[in-house]
Amino acid sequence: MRKIVNLTKPKGEIVRLMIYNDDFGTYLFGYNKTVDCSSEFDELFESENDAMESCETEYGIKKEEWTEIPNPEPNCQHDWINPVRIKGRQNGNPEFGKLEKRINGNWIEFESIE
């Protein structure tokens, strides 16, 4: 499960954080929007505990403030809340810069909000 939190006191332009665990460690994603979008930054930690301690120090976020959300679906971007993927990634022909999101079971190309 991923974890997400909106900051009550934004730090610079950062207003939302997400934590995601995989085989390499724990990623912390930072966002400048509260709507579902790609992150502004990512940082890799050895463990979820290390990432959460960093968030408490840097952003004042306590462990109980995080909300769990499902992990991304296969071939989907880890930093988006809803299923979003790079077009063609699922068949080994990624078209970087082109994104698709799943709407009512269909993958639809869209332009990301920047």
Stretch-by-stretch model annotation:
Residues 13-39:
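Short aromatic-glycine-(Arg/Gly/Cys) micro-motifs in beta-strand/loop hairpins
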Residues 61-114:
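Short, mixed-charge low-complexity intrinsically disordered segments
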Residues 41, 45-62:
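A short, charged, amphipathic alpha-helix used as a generic interaction element across diverse proteins
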Residues 26-30, 35-36, 50, 58, ...:
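A C-terminal-region feature
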Residues 1-6:
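Short, hydrophobic/aromatic-rich segments at coil-to-beta transitions
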Residues 18, 38-48, 112:
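Short amphipathic beta-strand/extended segments with alternating polar/hydrophobic composition
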